[in-house]
């Protein structure tokens, strides 16, 4: 339940996609999400003959199309005067007031996933895949589960994307993140996660 990873391996000339699913019980068997920000949940596989016709991650207590969480890269999470976490302080490429970070937990390095940023109905950019932490989830586990900073529980994974708006800031902009998984599924969000409400 610590993370959700999708890794691609080559074995005997064949490409193998390995899924390490997040858990329905979350991190440490009690949290509301995994250490990498993946919501509690499970994998769904639709089989046709001897092929996987569709696959997606189903978050518990959420609709099947809940696949993305978006953040302002310059927002700092944590308690004022205490430990705080954020992308801008840790990744120079994301230190821009126009930058949005997306956690697309079911994405992988296959090249089949396309994640794009839209503003006012116009495509702004293809978002850049990046290996990083979900600092919102990191702060959540430090604050609510008393996890120590600098220990190995934090997961630096590669199912995150970032991109800059054409203008304005994420909190004020009319934006949409669109993720296409290569299996015919398209997921969207225009909601910015700013606090721990609902978790």
Located regions from the model:
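Short beta-strand edge segments in extracellular beta-sheet folds
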Residues: 192-198
């Amino acid at each position: 339940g610590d993370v959700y990873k999708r890794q691609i391996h080559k074995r005997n000339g064949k490409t193998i996609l390995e899924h390490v699913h997040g858990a329905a019980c979350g991190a440490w068997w009690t949290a509301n999400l995994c250490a990498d920000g993946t919501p509690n949940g499970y994998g769904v596989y639709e089989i046709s003959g001897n092929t996987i016709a569709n696959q997606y991650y189903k978050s518990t207590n959420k609709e099947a199309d809940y696949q993305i969480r978006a953040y302002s890269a310059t927002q700092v999470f944590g308690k004022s005067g205490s430990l705080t976490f954020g992308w801008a302080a840790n990744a120079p490429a994301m230190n821009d007031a126009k930058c949005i970070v997306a956690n697309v937990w079911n994405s992988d390095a296959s090249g089949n996933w396309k994640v794009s940023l839209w503003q006012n109905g116009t495509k702004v950019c293809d978002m850049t895949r990046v290996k990083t932490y979900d600092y919102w989830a990191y702060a959540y586990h430090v604050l609510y589960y008393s996890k120590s900073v600098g220990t190995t529980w934090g997961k630096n994974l590669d199912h995150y994307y970032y991109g800059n708006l054409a203008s304005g800031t994420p909190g004020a902009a009319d934006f949409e993140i669109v993720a296409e998984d290569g299996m015919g599924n398209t997921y969207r969000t225009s909601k910015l996660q700013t606090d721990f409400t609902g978790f």
